[in-house]
Amino acid sequence: MATFKRLLAWISDLRIAIGLLLVIALASALGTAIPQGELRESYLEGYSDKPWLGFVNGSMILRLQLDHVYTSSWFLALLAWLGLALILCSWRRQWPALQAALQWIDYQEPRQLSKLAIAETISSPPKNESIDKLAAHLHQQGWQVQQQPGRLAARRGIIGRAGPMLVHLGLVLLMLGAVWGSLGGNRLEQFLAPGRSLDLLNRDGNSHLKLTLTNFGIERDPAGRPEQFRSQLELLEPGQDTAKLHEVSVNHPLRFHGLTVYQADWSLAAITLQLGRSPQLQLPLRTFPELGEQVWGLVLPTNPDGSEPVLLSLTSEAGPVQVFDATGERLASLRPAGPTAEVKGIPIRIVDVLPASGLLLKRDPGVPLVYIGFLITLVGGGLSMIATRQLWAVGDPENECLHVGGLCNRNLTGFANELPSLLAAAVPQQ
């Protein structure tokens, strides 16, 4: 039993909790520095030639579960340890301290008050009128007063003692919500072109929501840089005849029945062009990372046998569309809805470019718990700032004086400076 108590004391030690917080903060920094949730091959290939920090290669990242830090077994174990430490600290220290603070201490002798952090003796009338006046004045100032014949005890700000326990409770709820969201949540990144739909299935494999992108717009500044992206969405639930219309933009997500849709990215999905007198052709675009970070295009043959291909590349839905041959020489520059240009004897006209909206869909069941925990933590932190002040007074009719003592868990100097004015208002000096 003694060993078990020592173990509990060690787990709930404040230094251990601070160390755990530092380790968790460091682990969170690792999760920020290393891309999370990518394919296994991307870590093996991306960190083989250039190890992270010079020695952490892809295999080590996978072994240490650094590719999914926030759901790794060791990170969840750290959170569980910290949560247990907070619970034990509240149980072994904060709760007994709160219970002790709620109990009245009845000091009856002046010598008991002389041992307190603040002790003072003032002259008073021979009767106990000073005790009555002090009790009435403290009541007016918002103090709780317990008066006995010839003495009194008073306290104020006792609610501040509950602050640390609420902080611990809020942190535990916050961590539980984060773990619940990591293990029980879903995340999906999807590019949708206007007119395309996405069926979201429940655990039984049945559709519970159909999401359709009706329109996607990109707002650009005068220099052509994107400033805002807006997606017009239709949400249709099973059994409903009318879809609900919603708009999603950057920093303005859509929340719908526990599902959150973010405007996360954009892309170019397809290009519509016309070759000579041919019908309009809509061809898919793909990215060319070797040409730049946001470069899309397609390779278009100019002969029936597929020879002499040309590359059509562009960086925005507004164009221009650059045309290059196999040697890298630029042959033409076209604009959507612009004039026709002849490339290797073929008239080419760009009709339009179809942008795609990059949507991030998240279902996080732990979000309400995180919000509640955060709110409780804020309330507890605010209450912890309230100073708990205790005051005792014992009358001494024989010596015509009043002995006063006090304690304060925060800003003791301020309480000591306030005490003379408090006593002067209650027991005016002659």
Curated annotation (Swiss-Prot):
Keywords: Cytochrome c-type biogenesis, Membrane, Thylakoid, Transmembrane, Transmembrane helix. InterPro entries: Cyt_c_bgen_Ccs1/CcsB/ResB, ResB-like_domain. It is a multi-pass membrane protein. The keyword Glycoprotein does not apply. The keyword Transmembrane helix applies. Pfam families: ResB. One of its GO terms (biological process) is cytochrome complex assembly. One of its GO terms (cellular component) is plasma membrane-derived thylakoid membrane. The chain crosses the membrane at residues 14-34, 72-92, 162-182. It comes from the Bacteria. Its main location: membrane. It is found in: Cellular thylakoid membrane. Required during biogenesis of c-type cytochromes (cytochrome c6 and cytochrome f) at the step of heme attachment. PANTHER family: CYTOCHROME C BIOGENESIS PROTEIN CCS1, CHLOROPLASTIC. May interact with CcsA. Belongs to the Ccs1/CcsB family. This is Cytochrome c biogenesis protein CcsB.
